[in-house]
Design a protein with these regions (language model features):
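Feature marking well-ordered beta-strand scaffolds used for ligand recognition
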Residues: 1-306
Length: 306
């Protein structure tokens, strides 16, 4: 079996300019990776690349993008016939903030994130947090309001439909890096901030609970997912973390594991997810180098029965 394309000296970070114009050198999927999978349809989104998150409902598909090689904004497709997706609208957003995550809360409410790009941090017209849309007309969402949070805003919101709570990786004054923000979504038109969770060492005045030489400034939450009354979190270079949200207003840290520190595995923990009805978790890493030049990261499975 041939190995994927690999560059021993990958380009990492540097912002969007590092990605523009780079020749794509990735391999195609291996045959065994496409077992029992059939391509039904494809849309080039009119050249709007860099698709990040997709939500489908009511016969429409909402695709959020963040423009490195594409556009900042959202594409709406009619997918009533899944084999023939048709673009029905494209909404361009300001490049001042990333709005690359979209959530379809119900038939009427659509939410995107708003994460301010560092170079626009002092722009008074840029708001970080959540953006609320009236989606009564599913082809023409209408912006209603911002739900503002501190700092650069919110990176990745996840909606817990069973508990009507939203778990976001976002910023909070007095804390370093992104922390877990909890919003009450009983009124989806007006999300209410009710709780905050963090890793010891993120709050001002606390000592790091991680190895600073290995983790560096990578101790921050990327994503929080519901698992009953718990939230499972990919915590970037500091591994995976679980919080007890029996009281969502007072998230309690339970434990952290980080093979990046203990076993030299890759960092960039993206997602820690227990599928609904399962007793096993899936943990993924994110590739953070141009052209995915870094050696492939892992997909790990955890037994969550205890």
């Amino acid at each position: 079996m041939s190995r994927p394309y690999y560059n021993p000296k990958p380009i990492r970070g540097g912002g969007p300019e590092a990605y523009i114009g780079v020749d794509h050198q990735l391999t195609e999927p291996w045959p065994e990776e496409s077992s029992n999978v059939k391509l039904v349809a494809h849309s080039d989104l009119n050249g709007w690349g860099d698709a990040f998150q997709i939500q489908v409902g009511g016969g429409y598909c909402y695709v959020a993008a963040s423009g490195v090689n594409g556009h900042d904004g959202m594409t709406i497709l009619d997918v009533k016939d899944p084999a023939n997706p048709k673009i029905v609208n494209q909404i361009t957003d300001s490049p001042a903030a990333r709005t690359h995550k979209v959530l379809r809360i119900n038939d009427e409410v659509l939410i995107t994130n708003s994460e301010i790009r560092p170079s626009f941090k002092d722009d008074p017209e840029v708001v970080g947090g959540l953006r609320i849309f009236d989606n009564t007309d599913p082809v023409h969402p209408k912006f209603i309001n911002y739900i503002e949070v501190d700092g650069f805003g919110i990176h990745r919101p996840i909606y817990d439909r069973k508990r009507k709570l939203m778990y976001s990786s976002g910023f909070r004054d007095g804390y370093t890096g992104k922390v877990l923000l909890v919003h009450d979504m009983k009124d989806p038109w007006a999300p209410e901030f009710i709780g905050l969770g963090w890793l010891e060492g993120q709050k001002d005045g606390e000592s790091p609970s991680w190895d600073p030489e290995i983790v560096g400034d990578g101790a921050w939450i990327h994503e929080g997912n519901p698992f009953g009354n718990y939230v499972t979190c990919g915590y970037w270079d500091s591994g995976i973390v679980m919080f007890d949200l029996t009281d969502p207003a007072k998230p309690e840290f339970m434990w952290r594991q980080n093979p990046h520190e203990t076993h030299g595995w890759p960092g960039c923990y993206h997602t820690f997810l227990v599928p609904d009805g399962s007793e096993f978790a899936i943990v993924t890493h994110e590739t953070t180098t141009v052209n995915c030049d870094h050696p492939p990261a892992f997909v790990t499975f955890y037994d969550m029965r205890n």
